[in-house]
């Protein structure tokens, strides 16, 4: 501990590394989410003059355009994107130099400042030292808040997928308002049947993320005294 690990503890180095790794994944996810939103907006423009029936409680209500449906899909995801961007900024506050419980024992202020500067230079991100290192070492609410935002995004994404499945139902005895791309043969016994496999796969991925959020919540709930030892399962 006199050389490579000087001024460090698992309780500051590990949380710092995981938060920055999550932030890196966040940036990649946002770029993919932007592509999805752009695709939905493109379809909204394409279908702006296509009339369909609007429905409440699955019953016919009033006419609308198919473009309005796709614009609403895009807007709901855009809203959640903004929440994710806002909540992700907490990952840029690190506790390097906090050492064991946040008091900074066996560390120095100069070390903390040097760490933050080195991380900024390496990543080009606006990384800062947490205001309260004891709180930052014991509390994992940044992960909880971000996971909640992911859960909400996936809940809305499930709604989009469910609507696409309903609108593509049929073709003879369902709504048959849209045609989803044929990704694979749908049945070995019913020739020509095509299943909405992409929305179904996305739904299942979302269910996993929503389940992970429960795990993150329980992990955050298990924080005791000066350290949350459940961060590995939360990450």
Language-model segments: which ranges?
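Conserved, well-structured ligand/cofactor-binding cores
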Residues: 1-235
């Amino acid at each position: 501990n006199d050389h490579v690990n000087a001024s460090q503890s698992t309780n500051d180095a590990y949380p710092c590394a995981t938060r920055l790794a999550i932030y890196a994944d966040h940036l990649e996810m946002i770029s993919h989410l932007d592509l999805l939103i752009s695709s939905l907006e493109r379809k909204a423009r394409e279908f702006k003059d296509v009339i369909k029936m609007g429905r409440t409680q699955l019953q016919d209500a009033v006419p609308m355009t198919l473009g309005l449906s796709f614009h609403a899909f895009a807007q709901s995801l855009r809203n959640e994107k903004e929440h994710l961007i806002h909540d992700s900024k907490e990952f840029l506050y690190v506790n390097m130099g906090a050492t064991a419980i946040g008091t900074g024992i066996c560390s120095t202020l100069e070390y903390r400042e040097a760490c933050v500067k080195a991380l900024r230079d390496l990543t080009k991100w606006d990384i800062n030292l947490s205001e309260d290192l004891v709180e930052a070492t014991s509390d994992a609410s940044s992960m909880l808040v971000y996971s909640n935002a992911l859960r909400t995004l996936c809940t809305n994404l499930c709604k989009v997928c469910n609507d696409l499945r309903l609108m593509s139902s049929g073709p003879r005895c369902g709504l048959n308002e849209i045609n989803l791309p044929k990704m694979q043969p749908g049945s070995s016994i019913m020739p020509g049947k095509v299943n909405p496999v992409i929305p179904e796969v996305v739904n299942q991925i979302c269910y996993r993320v929503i389940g992970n959020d429960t795990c993150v919540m329980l992990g955050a709930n298990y924080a005791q005294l000066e350290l949350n030892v459940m961060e590995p399962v939360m990450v």
